[in-house]
Each structure stands twice: as C-alpha cells, then as structure tokens.
Regions:
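Sec-dependent signal peptide recognition
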Residues: 3-8
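Cyclophilin-like peptidyl-prolyl cis-trans isomerases
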Residues: 2, 13-175
C-alpha cells in the first residue's frame, strides 16, 4: 500500500512539473530607452545592449539575476572556440540554474556574431545560463532566445577561456 501511495505521489509531482509555466517578470519598461549590461570577466569587460523590446521577460530575468549578484563569481563553464562562451551555471557543469525556468520568447533576432542568448535543455527550460556567440550560429535560430548584442568587448569574448570567472554584471538603464 505504501508503495502505491509513493507511486501516485511521484506521478502527481511529475505531472505538475510537466504542466508548470515559466516564471514571468512584470517589469515596466516605459520611459526606458536602453538597458546595458557590463559583464566584468577575468579577461576584461563585455558591454551588451539588452533588447527588452524583443525579449522583455528574458531581459527582466537576466537583469534580476545580475542585480541580485547571482552571476558574481560564476565561471564560463563551456567555451567552444569559434562558436560561443557559456556561463551562468552555479554548479559549473551545465546542469545548474536559479531554481526556476522561463518560457522562450521567439523573436526576429538571429544568432549573429556577438549576440547573447539563453541556453536551454529544450523548449521553455531556460533559467540563468546564457551564451555569447563568437560567430554567426544560424542553426540555433528559433531554438534559443536572443536578447542582446555585444557593443564593446568582442575581443574579450574571443579571449575568454573555460573556467574564466564572471566577476560581476552591472546593469545600466538609460531613460
């Protein structure tokens, strides 16, 4: 009998996970012209214009985590030269996140050279992990939410090595 109860409870838990919706941030962007993130790494600074018009919830999630200091001290745990650098995993091995997921935000932004996009394990599974492209990666279009573009520090993106640290991420909202 106890085994049946455990089985039923386990199935209920799995079903509730399957139908869970991603976390939604209700950030008001009225009056804001642009949002920039400066990622300070062991190799230098990367400045990114965040596109809150095309990916409002994704940007709000990234900004919220950055302002809480979530990314401070984490590493770029995955670096594939000529492809991308990936960070934002508190476990440092590609499996960690903030304890919740956000839904994808399909948009017209493409995986061109120097864009920031959310890493995921499939549809609607993004959390805190992001990657920055070192070259155009159009095979990723429609599979990951692009939410910004590097405006300064592409040379830093190309110098980052696996396990280099994200010292901090500072957010600047221009009105």
């Amino acid at each position: 009998m106890i085994k049946k109860i455990i089985l039923v409870l386990s199935l209920f838990g799995l079903c509730s996970l399957a139908f869970a919706e991603g976390k939604v941030f209700n950030k008001d962007y009225s009056g804001i012209k642009e949002i920039q993130a400066t990622i300070t790494t062991d190799e230098g600074e990367i400045v990114i214009d965040l596109n809150f018009k095309e990916a409002p919830n994704t940007v709000a999630n990234f900004v919220d985590l950055a302002e809480k200091g979530f990314y401070n001290g984490l590493t770029f745990h995955r670096v594939i030269n000529g492809f991308m650098i990936q960070g934002g995993d508190p476990d440092g091995n590609g499996t960690g996140g903030p304890g919740y997921t956000i839904d994808d935000e399909p948009n017209k932004l493409l995986h061109e050279y120097g864009v920031i996009s959310m890493a995921n394990r499939g549809p609607n599974t993004a959390g805190s992990q992001f990657f920055i492209t070192q070259m155009a990666q159009h095979h990723l279009d429609g599979k990951h939410t692009v939410f910004g573009r590097v405006t300064k520090g592409n040379d830093v993106v190309c110098r980052v090595e696996q396990f280099d640290r994200i010292i901090n991420i500072k957010i600047l909202e221009k009105k």
